[in-house]
């Protein structure tokens, strides 16, 4: 079984923990408990290019609060996928994807070369909630739209934008989509590298390998 390390980052109260608990334990926590660090695991069988493959998802939950800024990166080494979370009803958490979280990942990318970024919008059930809309309107804001999420993902060079609600919809499908996109992007990188090597050689030219005595 293949293992994939997935680290969730983003502002506190964006729904990271609820989402992971719902995915792995099929229950929705009613009380908000701030996370320091937590690990979860989920096993999934996912079709990749028409072939069913089994994966063990190692899910790392991190604290978004500023007081954990020096500790949080300790979970980054060896990461395959970073999930950058924002909450659709919290525009500030959306802005902080670019203001904080992308910069933090970039600062530690040496410990996780090849890691891919995905932007995840949570609490989609609140996008059409009248109370949420009214509260945000009073502050001159609005629930983040799907289009805005897609544009943000493109802006920061993420693989994709996905969204879901841990309460109501689309949770397992989101993780299937993320894993499929991750492995398809890796295949494209390998294919591109192979094509570059092929084009670099002149027609009929033999490949010469130099071996050092040292």
Predicted regions and their residues:
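Conserved P-loop small GTPase signature centered on TRAFAC-class small GTPases
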Residues: 1-13, 17, 21-24, 43-54, ...
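Adenine-nucleotide cofactor-binding loop residues
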Residues: 63, 89, 167
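Post-Walker A helix-loop "phosphate-sensing" segment adjacent to the P-loop in P-loop NTPases
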Residues: 25-33
């Amino acid at each position: 079984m293949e293992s994939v390390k997935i680290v969730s980052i983003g502002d506190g109260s964006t729904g990271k923990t609820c989402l992971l608990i719902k995915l792995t334990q099929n229950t929705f926590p009613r009380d908000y408990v701030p996370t320091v660090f937590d690990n979860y695991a989920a096993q999934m069988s996912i079709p990749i290019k028409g072939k069913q493959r089994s994966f063990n998802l190692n899910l790392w939950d991190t604290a978004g609060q500023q007081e954990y800024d020096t500790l949080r990166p300790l979970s980054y080494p060896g990461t395959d996928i970073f999930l950058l979370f924002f909450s659709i009803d919290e525009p500030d958490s959306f802005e902080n994807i670019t203001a904080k979280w992308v910069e933090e990942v970039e600062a530690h990318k040496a410990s996780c070369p090849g890691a891919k970024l995905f932007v995840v919008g949570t609490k989609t059930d609140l996008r059409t909630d009248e109370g949420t809309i009214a509260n945000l309107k009073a502050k001159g804001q609005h629930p983040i739209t799907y289009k805005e999420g897609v544009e943000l993902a493109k802006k920061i060079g993420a693989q994709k934008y996905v969204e879901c609600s841990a309460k109501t919809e689309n949770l397992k499908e989101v993780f299937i989509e993320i894993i499929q996109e991750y492995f398809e992007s890796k295949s494209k990188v390998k294919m591109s590298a192979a094509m570059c090597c092929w084009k670099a050689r002149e027609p009929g030219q033999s490949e010469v390998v130099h071996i050092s005595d040292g």
